[in-house]
């Protein structure tokens, strides 16, 4: 294969990798944890990844402890966990 063909193949593979959504095997384990408000009761609107619905949903975070499946924005949740 010529060097031009190899460069084209490399470019296509790179583009495919960038455009491929996060798969469950690439998703961090904490994305499978349930939403957990924690013991505090401040009440911050937050987002968690729901693996059954395969999307990020809003919940109220108490402000301390809880699980790592807790994001300030829906966009952050989706870029980390959503397929």
Swiss-Prot record:
Q: In which tissues is it expressed?
A: Expressed by the venom gland.
Q: What is its main location?
A: secreted
Q: Name one GO cellular component term.
A: extracellular space
InterPro entries listed in its UniProt record: Kunitz_BPTI, Kunitz_BPTI_sf, Prtase_inh_Kunz-CS, TFPI/VKTCI-like
| Family annotation (SMART domains) | KU (SM00131)
Quick check: keyword Signal in the entry?
yes
| Subcellular locations according to the entry | Secreted
The family assignment reads:
Belongs to the venom Kunitz-type family.
UniProt-recorded name of the protein: Kunitz-type serine protease inhibitor scutellin-1
The organism encoding this protein is: Oxyuranus scutellatus scutellatus (Australian taipan)
Q: What is the lineage of its organism?
A: Eukaryota, Metazoa, Chordata, Craniata, Vertebrata
